Amino acid sequence: MVAKINRLSRLTPLLFVFAPFLAQSNMTVYPMAVSINSQGEGNVRVISKSNEVQYIKATVFRIDNPSTPQENEVEIKSGDANHLVVMPPKFALPAGSSKTVRFVAMEPEQKEKNYRVKFEAVPSIDDVATDKKDLSMQLTVNLIWGIVVSVPPQQPIAKLEVNAAQKLVNAGNQRLKILTIAYCKNNSKENCKIQTVNKNIFPGQERNLESISGYDKIVVKYNNWITKDNGEFELAVH
């Protein structure tokens, strides 16, 4: 019998649980979300909470259509230089120790990419288990830690537009977190209705606006995860 926790929220760090009998966590991973830096690198620390040596395997999944009902994960072949590479992809974790694992984006990206890297304990470094190890794995919970890794574009562009269908569009090449949308009359910031959003919009994605009848413009306040600052766009609506 194997039980699995369903996805709790989209593009967030996840902890998957396969729990035949006993519930215990034999490792932790920190941090649970990583942004690749300008050198194309990032890292996490895998920390043992076990009294025994563990063998850890990392698997990379590309996240397609993030934060939409069509979101899905596509497994990336280990060592594929066109995607995120984990170093090392497999390793031994001695009791009570920790291990730094590096993420490397091998090629510059034209548009933001997001990955989920899953860390799990396996019976051996070669995934070949003995009967004794098989039994041990069956009698303890197998926790899979899902780390979100964001790779920025080489030349980030933050851009929002209102399209002909009167929808807000991310016309840039990186995600933005929409904080609020102000619907304003008479081209003034003083006569506005404020909508709180606090949701990401990814490159190419659209977002429905509230009724814009009677309004002249919207003021969209956002957070930029790459520069780590806030900004705003004033966009005419007709």
What does each model-found stretch correspond to?
Residues 1, 24-27:
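Absolute protein N-terminus
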Residues 2-13:
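Bacterial N-terminal signal peptides that target proteins for export
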Residues 15-16, 72:
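Short hydrophobic/aromatic-rich motifs at helix boundaries and adjacent loops
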Residues 18-22:
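N-terminal signal peptide c-region/cleavage motif recognized by signal peptidases
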Residues 26-94, 98-238:
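Intrinsically disordered, low-complexity regulatory regions in eukaryotic proteins
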